[in-house]
Swiss-Prot record:
Needed co-factor(s): Mg(2+)
Catalytic activity line of the entry: a 2'-deoxyribonucleoside 5'-diphosphate + ATP = a 2'-deoxyribonucleoside 5'-triphosphate + ADP; a ribonucleoside 5'-diphosphate + ATP = a ribonucleoside 5'-triphosphate + ADP
Keyword Transport: no
Name by which UniProt lists this protein: Nucleoside diphosphate kinase, mitochondrial
Function: Major role in the synthesis of nucleoside triphosphates other than ATP. The ATP gamma phosphate is transferred to the NDP beta phosphate via a ping-pong mechanism, using a phosphorylated active-site intermediate. Through the catalyzed exchange of gamma-phosphate between di- and triphosphonucleosides participates in regulation of intracellular nucleotide homeostasis. Binds to anionic phospholipids, predominantly to cardiolipin; the binding inhibits its phosphotransfer activity. Acts as a mitochondria-specific NDK coupled to respiration.
Gene Ontology terms: biological process: CTP biosynthetic process; GTP biosynthetic process; UTP biosynthetic process
UniProt lineage: Eukaryota, Metazoa, Chordata, Craniata, Vertebrata
Compositionally biased tracts (Basic residues): 1-10
Pfam (any one): NDK
First-level EC class: transferase
């Protein structure tokens, strides 16, 4: 178990991860958070969904909800409410409705901040190698994934994309090995 400081992803210079235990998904319930991750239409078309899922599973996070859907304008207007007045919003809306996307809820210790580190900078030109965007994104307007930026935002966004009964509470078998009985 890792405690304190930041550490590097294997083979990924410069990518620091937050403080805390190394096996993030297996923390006791009182230490768990949830976050929303959207695999955007460009990544679905390029068949990158499995690559994204694999990165979260390798970090020990637990998938508690997932669905493939064609997002409509109403849902995206709620999700991107803070961007609706921006000049690029019509292009963002066209992009996000251009094909199916995958919405997922991941659970684990410090999952929001860890996910932001894993996803990388919004601008693919500056996203670090080893991050999802650094490895797969080709342009700032086609940046592969969305990830909630705070615990509060995650709670709100999860409510837009999922009904409460769509989140599956299940016990991860690796908790005892990581945290003890």
């Amino acid at each position: 178990m890792f405690r304190g400081g930041t550490h590097r992803l294997r083979g990924q210079p410069g990518l620091s991860l937050p403080h805390g235990p190394r096996c993030y998904g297996s923390a006791p319930p009182e230490l768990q958070e949830k976050t929303l991750v959207l695999v955007k239409p460009d990544a679905v078309q390029r068949r990158l969904v499995g690559n994204v899922i694999q990165r979260f599973e390798r970090r020990g996070f637990k998938l508690v909800a997932m669905k493939l859907l064609q997002a409509d304008q109403g849902l995206l207007d709620k999700h991107y409410q803070q961007l609706r007045q921006k000049p690029f919003y019509p292009a963002l809306l066209a992009y996000m409705t251009s094909g199916p996307l995958v919405a997922m809820v991941w659970e684990g210790y410090n999952v929001v901040r860890s996910t932001r580190a894993m996803v990388g900078d919004t601008d693919s030109a500056v996203a670090a190698a080893g991050t999802i965007r650094g490895d797969f994104s080709m342009h700032v307007s086609r940046n592969v994934v969305h990830a909630s930026d705070s615990v509060e935002t995650a709670q709100r966004e999860i409510g837009f994309w999922f009904q409460r009964n769509e989140l599956v509470a299940w016990e991860s078998g690796d908790r005892d090995y990581t945290w003890g009985p």
